[in-house]
Amino acid sequence: MQKVRNKQKGMIAGARVLGASLILSTSLLAPFATVYAETGEGRVPNVTLPTGVPTNYDLTWFDEFDGNKLDRTKWDYSLSSFDPKARTQMHFTDDPANVSLKDGILHLTALYTPKQLKWNPNTKKNEWVDRENTYKDPKTGQTITYKAPFTSGAIQTRDRHGKVLTEFVGDFYAESRIKLPFSESSWASFWMTGTKGGGSPKSGEIDVFESKGYDPKFIQANIHTAPTQEKDEKKKKTQEKYSDQYQQKLPNNGDTQTAFHTYGVLKQGDKVTFFYDGQAVYTLKYSQIKNKEAFVNPENGFILRLTHIVGGSFVKDFDGGTRNYTDAIPYKDSYKDGSRSDMQIDYVRVWQPNAKPVTTEEPTTTTTTTTTTV
């Protein structure tokens, strides 16, 4: 595992890499320093950091998605269901119908796929059955099963067995250029979770953005930490919650589903700053966070995640709104061919301070593979 260290402070401030690491970036950036890096699948263009990102940050990891297969040294597929307690209605797969690369774009495509092949131990055959999700109700202990007739795509810099491929430690700036899906129940996001502290939310979570397909103007950044339990004086009991959250809607002109935009986050020693199209739009200081351990722990790294969820409790109006698309089944036609339900990622890049920039004299080749499970 490679460790890139901060040359000034002598402490970890870079990416721990197994195989490779991930970077998120934007096409609107223009160069502050010339960076040429080849993977055998494309040369990194000259880029410039947005105003507000320190000029001593160097490009240390990237994926331009210029090949025809996912680079498995950098990413792995998320598989099966995700967050069924929120009543999400999809299964993540590694099927090319859900995760594909074409013309330099990564596509995470959600589709209405109501049936799946499942092994029947009685007949000893694979049989077509309804696609479903299951979870255990924490209050009653009852097992809940519900229809989940969609498939979709999600990737991360940790493999399906829990092995970290890349984590970014200390200060970094990460950015991605993305066009969002506009199917009503789509919940697309670029986010990060910490590797130390027992899993999210205790290990920290950074939502660079989350979106709602039915509302192109809804773009929200968020920070999750371990929850601070609060006592409800009226009910004389402690209110349980999943996490402490520090969300902020990001200003935009509403064309997030028809044009590419860049979404970035700058994590520093005392604060996190979110960027939209190269402009700083929201800063959260650690002094404002009640449970800040995950963000001040010098050993806690963050993996990168790109996700296209369908349905679930997030896809509705809050603050008195009436729109509700938590159940995607009435909108299944919006997921028939992928034309409306396609999350498109142009590239991802990460910069880190005082680190050795990515430069190569000669192209290097990358072997990529993919697998499909039923």
Name each model feature, range by range:
Residues 18-24, 28:
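Hydrophobic helical h-region of N-terminal Sec-dependent signal peptides
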Residues 366-372:
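Long, low-complexity Q/N-rich tracts
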Residues 26-43:
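Sec-dependent signal peptide cleavage junction
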